[in-house]
Amino acid sequence: MQDISAPMFSHDDYRVLHEGAALLDRTADRGRLELRGADRRDYLHGLLTNDIAALPAGAGCYAALLTPQGRMISDMRVSELGDRLVVDLAASASEGVRQRLADFIFSEDVEVQDIGAAVAQWGLYGPAAAQLAASVLAAGTASSDALASLPLYGNVERTFRDRPAILVRSDDFGIGGFEILIDASVSGLLQQALVDAGAQRIDVATADVARIEAGRPAFGRDMDTTTIPLEAGIEDRAISLTKGCYVGQEIIIRVLHRGQGRVAKRLVGMVGFAGEGPLLAGMRLESGGREAGSLTSAVDSPRLRRPIALGYVHRDFSEPGHVLEVRHGDDPVRTVTVVTTPFIQPAGE
């Protein structure tokens, strides 16, 4: 997770993300897997951290696939469509997850297929996303209100150019919106239709600013194959404490119950001071001469007008209010303060 770099983003795109309808091409950075067969839910339920068996058609959840040692292979969003499950996850993890899922199939009626090349993915986010999606994607009498009231991870099927389009409610960047899964052959036409209706294309750097402000870890940036979910703070969203066994459960339960949830390090939010220069992913953290951790994601927040970051900090220094030293080569030492996340509360909260 070492990455000394400063992301560049568009302030105009950032405004659209918060005030209008922002369109992000996610086809390349997200992978898409499909599971079919009568046993698909029970099968996936036994592997992932969340309650897949309980998902009715039109519902979904956030989950993780772990090693037996409790380390993350990937996080993912799981959508039950009624006749199949669709999983979307970081593209870098997609093939490894597909292979691992396939390796566990014995006599179960399950087929796992990579649909990443056949199905494109667009993210549509912001307060105008539901209204705009309803105007472009046909669905009989369904209204924009019906889309706006769709619960998180819920899904509905619509059509575009006589092709099915799956809309999944999401908040990956801390801003409500939808993942739109569409036949790749009409992806370009869908993009143009959404833009013609009022959406504005944004880049991933702009979306990443909102993600960091929301305190959301991203796989490959803030989580990797060495991470235990409890270290990343995703347990409330990704882990069911009432379901049956899953791979890696023993480690998770041991930490939660015997260790009272204590892990050696935690992903926390930190704020710096304007004028001291940007915070960069990969910068080292110290406290009183002791190594304290490192930054994993960082940006200058347009709304706070201060540099902010996510990073892993030793549990001795992870409580809000701790002041840590930031060190990077021969640069002057600067300081950050540990704070609670999200850095910015979503509108209406």
PLM regions: where:
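Acidic, proline/glycine-enriched N-terminal capping motif
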Residues: 1-62, 66, 71-75
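Acidic, low-complexity central loop/insert segments
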Residues: 22-24, 31-32, 77-217
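Residue-level signal for inorganic ion chemistry
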Residues: 37, 87, 124-126, 180, ...
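Short, conserved charged micro-motifs
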Residues: 39-44, 94-97, 129-133, 185-192, ...
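Glycine-centered loop/turn motifs
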Residues: 58-60, 145-160, 215, 220, ...
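Anionic-ligand-binding alpha/beta catalytic cores of soluble enzymes and soluble regulatory domains
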Residues: 179-267, 271-272
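Glycine-rich, small/acidic residue-mixed loop/short-helix segments
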Residues: 227, 233-240, 246-249, 253-349
